[in-house]
């Protein structure tokens, strides 16, 4: 609801992305962090002293999270790790104090199961230390918030930055990914409702052939359809958020049920938002292409939840396998 309100206010994806990593990226830390880690980090994250970013995605692995190549090698002394590798599409890395990092601590060819061998860390992003470099990525939308490539070259971190058990990072990080999908769904809804509000206002104000264009069913019906899609997606999103929250204390809720709900919500909200944003541009006609009316910005930004943090096709694969019990296709 918070993320929906932010994007719907006109702040769009940039407004939401400025803070959303502080919410979802810290979920695994809050659940699996030690007492000392929580006392050091959580109060400063809550009061705004520290910002966080989520260091998972890599340029050569994409959705194959289990094939991540960034390594965390424990040094001979045992009191530190050396990080080497590259992350990409890391939002707010330019301003973040902390990164929730997923890195490989056991080579993939040595693990007994594919989900083993990755570890999660909560590390300082000390730009004055050797071994850390960042490069901004020029984006189509949401330009008020930075997205980055982050390079590690023997970047040293203390051993006590490890969150949870070594080699169990993939299981831990999943607790942040479901939260991320819920947040992206809320952000998509906000964009869709903001675009729809602009479209209906224009459809009421714009007069052609002696009457408002919204009086024509060719304008009214697509907007009504977009509204119903947003409302349905909102219900799915709120259901997913409630299920995610409940699962934290109710062990009877299957983990995959939460995943299905959160992924479905992200998919439905992203599609509903795209429909609303596209129709808002078309309702404005030629002026929809003008920056003055803002709807072109909403259309650019609504592509983000369609693409990230997981593609539409992979969500369909996931639901096909987990719900419909169909053979895995990838």
Report the location of each language-model feature:
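Active-site-adjacent elements of ketosynthase-type condensing enzymes
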Residues: 59-69
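Flexible, small-/acidic-enriched active-site or ligand-binding loops
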Residues: 127-156
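Short Ser/Thr-interspersed hydrophobic loop/turn segments at strand-loop and sheet-helix junctions
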Residues: 2-7, 102-104, 123-129, 153-157
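A short core secondary-structure module
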Residues: 79-133
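Long, acidic (Asp/Glu-rich), low-complexity accessory segments flanking structured domains
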Residues: 154-172
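A short, Trp-centered hydrophobic/proline-enriched beta-strand micro-motif
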Residues: 47-56, 102
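A structural signal for short hydrophobic beta-strand segments in well-ordered beta-sheet cores
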Residues: 70-74
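Alpha-helical interface subdomain recognition
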Residues: 1-10, 16-19, 32-37, 44, ...
């Amino acid at each position: 609801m918070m993320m929906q309100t932010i994007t719907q206010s006109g702040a769009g994806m940039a407004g939401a992305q400025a803070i959303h990593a502080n919410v979802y990226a810290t979920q695994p830390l809050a659940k699996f962090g030690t007492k000392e880690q929580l006392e050091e980090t959580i109060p400063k994250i809550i009061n705004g002293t520290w910002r966080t970013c989520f260091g998972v995605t890599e340029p050569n692995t994409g959705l194959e999270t289990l094939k991540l190549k960034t390594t965390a090698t424990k040094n001979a002394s045992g009191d530190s790790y050396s990080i080497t590798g590259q992350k990409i599409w890391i939002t707010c890395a330019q301003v973040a104090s902390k990164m929730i990092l997923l890195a490989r601590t056991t080579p993939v060819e040595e693990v007994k199961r594919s989900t083993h061998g990755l570890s999660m860390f909560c590390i300082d992003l000390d730009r004055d230390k050797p071994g850390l470099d960042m490069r901004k990525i020029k984006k189509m939308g949401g330009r008020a918030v930075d997205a980055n490539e982050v390079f590690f070259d023997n970047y040293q971190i203390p051993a006590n930055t490890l969150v949870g058990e070594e080699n169990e990072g993939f299981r831990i990080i999943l607790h942040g990914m479901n939260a991320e999908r819920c947040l992206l769904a809320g952000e998509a809804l906000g964009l869709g409702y903001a675009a729809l509000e602009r479209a209906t206002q224009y459809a009421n104000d714009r007069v052609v052939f002696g009457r408002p264009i919204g009086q024509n069913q060719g304008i009214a019906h697509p907007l009504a359809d977009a509204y119903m899609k947003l409302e349905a997606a909102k219900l799915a999103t709120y259901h997913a958020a409630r299920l995610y929250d409940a699962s934290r204390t109710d062990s009877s809720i299957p983990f995959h049920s939460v995943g299905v709900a959160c992924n479905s919500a992200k998919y439905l909200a992203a599609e509903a938002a795209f429909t609303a944003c596209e129709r808002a541009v078309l309702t404005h006609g030629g002026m929809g292409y003008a920056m003055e009316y803002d709807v072109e910005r909403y259309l650019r930004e609504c592509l983000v939840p369609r693409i990230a943090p997981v593609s539409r096709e992979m969500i369909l694969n996931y639901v096909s396998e987990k719900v419909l019990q169909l053979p895995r296709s990838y």
